[in-house]
């Protein structure tokens, strides 16, 4: 493939959380009735060309996981439910993300859309990891970064993001 599309296209709403290390976007290829396999392929080409080597999905189902494997992109799947006790899922997601970032990997985290759930997971991670020491400050930082307000679902995820104890292991 040559020309403008040779390196693919960036995923919709792609935004760096930690420049050149950790980014978020909507699900590669889109979601629901707007999902397109061709677009997913182009976006996965772009992610590979940009050096991403870990994708973390917080979708409830295994959508796109076989495509990540086909593109030789390492992935983690941590379903974050819309309701209920999500603390264990958040903890597993945060440990995965922290391990990848500590290993100098380039990580993309996504949900179906870049909305409350992804915003809450990102703000929760920033708080959980100690990068931002207060939950409300993490919420404010993510709202500023993504240029949108976080609703109740996202704020609840931040509240559920318990800081690990110094001796915590997975």
Explain the meaning of each model-derived region.
Residues 115-121:
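Glycine-rich nucleophile elbow surrounding the catalytic serine of serine-hydrolase chemistry
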